[in-house]
């Protein structure tokens, strides 16, 4: 759900109970199940910083969705806490599809100082990121480290295997279904707003800055 749809959701919730996924709309009759996406993004960027990266970019979705706001906030928080400057040329917004990732990388690699690492808002976008990096003559992770977000099964099939923030989509859906069953059965869920924590899962798409060309 996008933040510009909140008012419509609030109106609908007056007559029937609703469950939102990865949105933070609060109101009577609204239940939510969401990931701590800001923390997931923060952990991903902090990991890259721990590897020695300072030129870290984010390829984010360009839709007006809270999911992208959370990820950008986590990205910025990690940089600030490690005393790294936030550079607007490293913040790229694209269509949240494979093509968007391809276009985002082309833009980043044209900057005066291309990033040595890229945090990508979704694994789907990461597919295009991989293709563009290779087409431009760069290697993963020797020249550019990449971290995705989502934990889709396709991440394991990418070469090299994508390091990603797993948001456990199946668990997210299961908890949402269980909550709705409780609500429809006139039960009282322990919490109206449930958090599913993300986990950074290491693949082979990241390496230390000392191993890269700078």
Residues of each region from the PLM?
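Central regulatory/effector-binding core of bacterial HTH transcription factors
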Residues: 1-6
């Amino acid at each position: 759900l996008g933040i510009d749809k909140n008012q419509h959701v609030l109106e609908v919730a007056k007559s029937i109970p609703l469950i939102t996924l990865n949105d933070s709309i609060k109101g009577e009759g609204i239940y939510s199940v969401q990931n701590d996406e800001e923390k997931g993004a923060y952990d991903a960027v902090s990991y890259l910083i721990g590897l020695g990266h300072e030129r870290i970019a984010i390829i984010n979705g360009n839709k007006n969705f809270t999911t992208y706001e959370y990820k950008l906030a986590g990205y910025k928080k990690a940089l600030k806490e490690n005393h790294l400057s936030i550079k607007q040329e490293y913040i790229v917004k694209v269509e949240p599809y494979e093509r968007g990732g391809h276009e985002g990388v082309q833009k980043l690699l044209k900057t005066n100082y291309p990033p040595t690492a890229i945090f990508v808002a979704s694994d789907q976008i990461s597919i295009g990121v991989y293709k563009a990096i290779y087409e431009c003559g760069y290697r993963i992770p020797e020249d550019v480290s990449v971290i995705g977000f989502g934990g889709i099964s396709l991440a394991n099939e990418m070469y090299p295997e994508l390091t990603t923030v797993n948001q456990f989509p199946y668990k997210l859906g299961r908890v949402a279904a269980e909550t709705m069953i409780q609500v429809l059965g006139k039960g009282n869920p322990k919490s109206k707003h449930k958090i599913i924590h993300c986990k950074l899962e290491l693949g082979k798409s990241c390496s230390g800055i000392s191993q890269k060309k700078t």
